[in-house]
Amino acid sequence: MESQCDYSMYFPAVPLPPRAELAGDPGRYRALPRRNHLYLGETVRFLLVLRCRGSVGAGVGGGAGLASRGAWTELATSLAALASVSAGGALPGCGSAGDQDADPPGGGDPGGGGLFRGCSPLLTHGQGPATSGGATTLPVEEPIVSTDEVIFPLTVSLDRLPPGTPKAKIVVTVWKREVEAPEVRDQGYLRLLQTRSPGETFRGEQSAFKAQVSTLLTLLPPPVLKCRQFTVAGKHLTVLKVLNSSSQEEISIWDIRILPNFNASYLPVMPDGSVLLVDNVCHQSGEVSMGSFCRLPGTSGYFPCPLSALEEHNFLFQLRGGEQPPPGAKEGLEVPLIAVVQWSTPKLPFTQSIYTHYRLPSVRLDRPCFVMTASCESPVRTYERFTVTYTLLNNLQDFLAVRLVWTPEHAQAGKQLCEEERRAMQAALDSIVCHTPLNNLGFSRKGSALTFSVAFQALRTGLFELSQHMKLKLQFTASVSHPPPEARPLSRKSSPSSPAVRDLVERHQASLGRSQSFSHQQPSRSHLMRSGSVMERRAITPPVASPVGRPLYLPPDKAVLSLDKIAKRECKVLVVEPVK
């Protein structure tokens, strides 16, 4: 019987007519425009048309199968169909667009596109939560039976296909619904198989109507998403670039969000069924909430945002949170992120919008424990005295003394500048005069805040930075570790001219009191001991004599302070001409 029917699948590009119109005019579907591609994540409605070959009522094969109108009507009313979808093409290889758009080593032009990283899609689904597993909640409609054909309105969702699937294989299975025999209802198949042979039990079902129809359609991927993360004055900013690169149709961006990926905080399930948390990964707590990333408003940040073919749009987000870590916060907290983009096209006849989830690079929250901020009135007039207020927030450790030193003459130290750049920098340095270049703030206890005002005067107009050349000098007491058991003590009775004793005394003096200064540009850990304007380390405590006979040892030479725990915030002032 299956060979006596023709099968056709119609994917309309417009909403289907009402069921009553299709039943009254079954051939109306032929005039509907068809689609030649689909979108990953959308819900597709289509028609499977089963048509009887020849005219109903004429003898087919000597009266077998569908020889009469009654036989066709009986078969058509007992048919059922179910659609499924699977990946129909070879998945892309390991090299993806996200790998090609990775950050180049050594950075690049801050305004160039090379600093944007490609973000791979994780999941794409339609309105509402994505269906999981093999279960489906899509509606099943009864077929429309006409004189010589049966129309099956079918629905299939494309949200379970892997990201990057190039083609979708849609398979429709058609079978004849039969009423179970009374003996099957009474005894069940297990009892019948135990008392009869399988061939005798299923002989009647071998002649039942069964057919399977499939087609292959092109899948268009979601919009391309790229990401760039940077920090400005201690604020974590993220720029998301959305690009319509695969569709020639216009798409609309309805919403875009950045959320913490709490699922990445868990390790795989242990054999006993327990689940462990990753220590340095943010989990569901008060550190980073679902609303921590806020989209900053802009002149072009309205929704919906239309994107034509090959058009892109940028969205700016900021991580909102306290600059100082909360009590009990972990150092170097890593926050896995995902981006959710809601988009649509006018060619989605049955889906209002599609949601695509992208994997973003993680953000590491290295909050500084010692922060220097500055504020002043702006603008100011030339030759007018103005005051800059510096605030030191100390959550690092106790310091014996804190000093602010205005040292613009060291700005060019260690830099290879051309003549034009040197003249421009020198002109900028000569434009600002500090009335009190040396300021002693005294003792700073951990958890305290120091505020100090410094007077300046501007000699030229322009925009000037007032934190870069204000060097921060911190004096602290270095902890002296206990000598290891295998260390051999040295006595003062040794010869004063001994090189070992002289080296020991110098290093012991340096361990009692140390000073470090920090400029606006923070070096990396590998340059911790670099001399110059960035950081200086020297002994400031006079030599302290050791009692005769008391053993001395050589303390380990290690970095006492880590530069990533100290930060300085920019402060700029605009200098204008006086009003005449």
Curated annotation (Swiss-Prot):
It is found in: Cytoplasm, Cytoskeleton, Spindle; Vesicle; Midbody. Keywords: Cilium biogenesis/degradation, Cytoplasm, Cytoskeleton, Phosphoprotein. The modification Phosphoserine is found at S491, S517, S546. GO terms for cellular component: centriolar satellite; midbody; mitotic spindle; plasma membrane; TRAPPII protein complex. Residues 512-525 have a biased composition (Polar residues). Residues 105-116 have a biased composition (Gly residues). Residues 95-134, 480-533 are annotated as: Disordered. GO terms for molecular function: alpha-tubulin binding. GO terms for biological process: cilium assembly; regulation of cell population proliferation. The modification Phosphothreonine is found at T541. It holds the Pfam family TRAPP14_N. It comes from the Eukaryota. Residues 492-502 have a biased composition (Low complexity). Specific subunit of the TRAPP (transport protein particle) II complex, a highly conserved vesicle tethering complex that functions in late Golgi trafficking as a membrane tether. TRAPPC14 is dispensable for TRAPPII complex integrity but mediates RAB3IP preciliary vesicle trafficking to the mother centriole during ciliogenesis. Modulates YAP1 activity as transcriptional regulator. Component of the multisubunit TRAPP II complex, which includes at least TRAPPC1, TRAPPC2, TRAPPC2L, TRAPPC3, TRAPPC4, TRAPPC5, TRAPPC6A/B, TRAPPC9, TRAPPC10 and TRAPPC14. TRAPPC9, TRAPPC10 and TRAPPC14 are specific subunits of the TRAPP II complex. Interacts with alpha-tubulin during mitosis. Interacts with RAB3IP (via the N-terminal region); this interaction mediates RAB3IP association with the TRAPP II complex. Interacts with TRAPPC10. Interacts with FBF1. PANTHER family: MICROTUBULE-ASSOCIATED PROTEIN 11, TRAFFICKING PROTEIN PARTICLE COMPLEX SUBUNIT 14. This is Trafficking protein particle complex subunit 14. The lineage of its organism: Eukaryota, Metazoa, Chordata, Craniata, Vertebrata. The gene is Trappc14.
